[in-house]
Amino acid sequence: MRIMARIGVENSLTDVQQALQQQGHEVVTLNSEQDAQGCDCCVVTGQDSNVMGIADTSIKGSVITAHGLTTDEICQQVESRT
């Protein structure tokens, strides 16, 4: 059985949070840079470029910018990066 990833998702992306939870991932709401620690991957809106400092090296995983992507596309990117 595949181990599911711990995914940080920006607060406003509730549809993405729900979709990832349905896939079995552990979803953490990103309210600050500290919330991103320990996440395998983070999904941010891309609206406020690097407002929380998440685009830098504060996490070991990749950062996915949701801007312009559908929920399904975001979930596919999460799957390919975790």
From Swiss-Prot:
Coiled coil (residue ranges): none
Protein origin, superkingdom: Bacteria
Record-stated family: Belongs to the UPF0180 family.
Source species taxonomy: Bacteria, Bacillati, Bacillota, Bacilli, Bacillales
Pfam families hit by this protein: UPF0180
Protein name: UPF0180 protein BC_1394
